[in-house]
Amino acid sequence: MKEKDKVLQALCDGLGEKYEIMMIDLERCIYRNFGNRFGVEVSGVHTTKQHKKATIYLWCMDETNDHGYIIKKVSDVPRNRIGKTVEELYEYSENLISQ
């Protein structure tokens, strides 16, 4: 396993059981499915550079969960803020559903 794969796995493990590593648009990313037709992609962290900031995309998926579109993007997220930012996006998705 390459060092950057180990770093990505450690970051994913640190975020918790709800997160997994997936290939999205030819990039190894961290993904979390919210279970409400929304999910997040944590991009830009498949590297050994600890100072590299993430870009987090909020996706809205279709009924089959095969196709989706990005409805919100949060850039320049430090690694120690990824979990908190994802929780904020979860709340945002729940608010969209309740409207």
Task: Give the location of each predicted region.
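Short intrinsically disordered terminal tails
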Residues: 1-2, 95-99
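Negatively charged, low-complexity tracts enriched in Asp/Glu with abundant Ser/Thr
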Residues: 1-37, 53, 61-86
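A short acidic-to-branched-hydrophobic micro-motif
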Residues: 40-44
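Catalytic phosphate/metal-binding cores of nucleic-acid and nucleotide-processing enzymes, i.e., regions
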Residues: 47-48
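Divalent cation-coordinating acidic motifs and surrounding scaffolds
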Residues: 87, 93
